[in-house]
């Protein structure tokens, strides 16, 4: 049987370093600069083991689709206390597209909109 495990998320950005700084400021991501196999520079970030590659988008690259759409919708970050996390992120200027709310018993969620319209779900799971 083949075993699969998480490796990375790859995001194209008009401003990779600006996007990396956003993730550093909001989520404490470590910023790592690297070079892709094609020789292009890339900014990688590490959010507590969640690796995200931020590659420079060409000026001709179209913006992403309007929500909702088929394909990758968002990625989620688990937090111990959603209200505390939301207050912390708001104090740093984060834009919430969905304010903290109860989704079902044992699950509270919120959504943050990062640069490039990347959607990040915050999840507080209990029980």
Question: Residue ranges of each PLM-predicted region?
Answer:
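Conserved short beta-strand elements that form part of the metal-binding/catalytic scaffold
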Residues: 30-66, 119-125
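Mid-chain, well-packed structural core segment of small domains
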Residues: 68, 74-89
